[in-house]
A protein has these predicted regions:
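ATP-dependent adenylation/pyrophosphate-handling site
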Residues: 22, 26-83
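A conserved beta-strand->alpha-helix junction
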Residues: 62, 98-111
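Metal-dependent de-N-acetylase/amidase catalytic core
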Residues: 1-34, 79, 103, 116-291
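Residues at the C-termini of beta-strands that transition into short coil/loop
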Residues: 61-63, 110, 179, 212
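Flexible loop residues that form catalytic
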Residues: 65, 111, 144
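Short, solvent-exposed amphipathic alpha-helices that sit
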Residues: 84-99, 157-161
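Active-site loop signature of alpha/beta-hydrolase-fold enzymes
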Residues: 65-67, 114, 183
Length: 291
């Protein structure tokens, strides 16, 4: 007799959420992920433990982590933007080696830090092409929460890339989110998703992954490998890590009400301008069925 689960296999999320055999059980889950993160170190902040509990993770960086404006770079950065980008690249390779991710599974899409939304069409095409080649079971990325304009761009890239694949009749991976940071009650909140009443999904759909002592040590070592980012990374705790299915976002509306975290930092991008660019891109995408 054929098992009902063979005819209707559980979704990747249901497999991850299974309390006995899922990602919180400590057993490695036979699902292949691609992580799309905005900058080198984002993958360690949000999903270092997840990477170790899944099969053959591939990590894709949306940008090189090097802003054009020297004032937006790490105090430890010296020299040209290209030199800083190389430093960020080398730190990522060293950090991910600690998680067993080999260099052929570490990819850069070529965006510039702080400017991903301006390159959104090209970045989405590149990522869709990668997904078609790799055919992962899941993609893990940032949530749309106004923490960093490049984080929000990563969420948009994943959403559009899946639609590109669907138009071409190709398989689309399930999309999950990890935590990063956002503004709440006047403070930067890390390690949590935006509350449900802000339209960001249900807390009942979240998985809180408690890291083992060994995983905590490895995460600390990975964070330490990002020598240039130590001032920023000091605000992040070691665990737990959280995952949830990505909601269907309206990228033309503000993620949370009020001011966004990156707006409070007086960066060049504003939420209003980001959404204006996103709306124009999405309108063009809808008008061009061949995209």
């Amino acid at each position: 007799m054929i098992s009902p689960n063979f005819l209707n296999p559980p979704s990747a999320w249901n497999r991850l959420a299974n309390p006995v055999t899922g990602i919180c059980s400590g057993i490695k889950v036979d699902l292949e992920p691609v992580l799309l993160v905005a900058h080198p170190d984002d993958e360690t902040i949000g999903a270092s433990g997840c990477m170790g509990r899944l099969q053959n993770p591939t990590v894709v960086f949306l940008t090189d982590g090097a802003p054009r404006d020297p004032g937006l770079r790490s105090p430890r950065a010296t020299g040209s933007r290209a030199r800083y980008a190389r430093l960020r690249h080398d730190e990522a390779i060293a950090a991910l080696a600690l998680a067993g991710v080999t260099t052929h599974r570490i990819l850069f899409l070529g965006g510039v830090d702080q400017e991903a939304i301006h390159e959104i069409a090209l970045l989405a095409e590149r990522f869709a092409s990668l997904l078609a080649q790799i055919q992962p079971d899941i993609v893990i990325t940032h949530s749309y929460e106004g923490g960093h304009p490049d984080h929000d761009a990563a969420a948009l890239v994943v959403a559009v890339s899946n639609r590109m694949l669907a138009r071409q009749g190709k398989p689309t991976p399930e999309v999950l989110e990890m935590t990063s940071y956002h503004l709440r009650d006047g403070k930067c909140v890390t390690g949590e998703f935006l509350p449900r009443d802000w339209g960001q999904g249900s807390a009942e759909e979240e998985l809180a992954i408690q890291l083992s002592p060994e995983e905590q040590v490895r995460k600390e070592q990975m964070l330490s490998a990002y020598i240039s980012q130590q001032v920023v990374l000091a605000r992040f705790s070691i665990g737990p890590e959280r995952l949830r299915p990505a909601p269907a976002y309206d990228f033309t509306s503000a993620p949370p009400p009020g001011k966004l975290w990156y707006e409070s930092l007086s960066w060049p991008m504003t939420g209003e301008r980001w959404r204006e660019i996103a709306a124009g891109f999405l309108a063009d995408f809808e008008e061009n069925p061949c995209a």
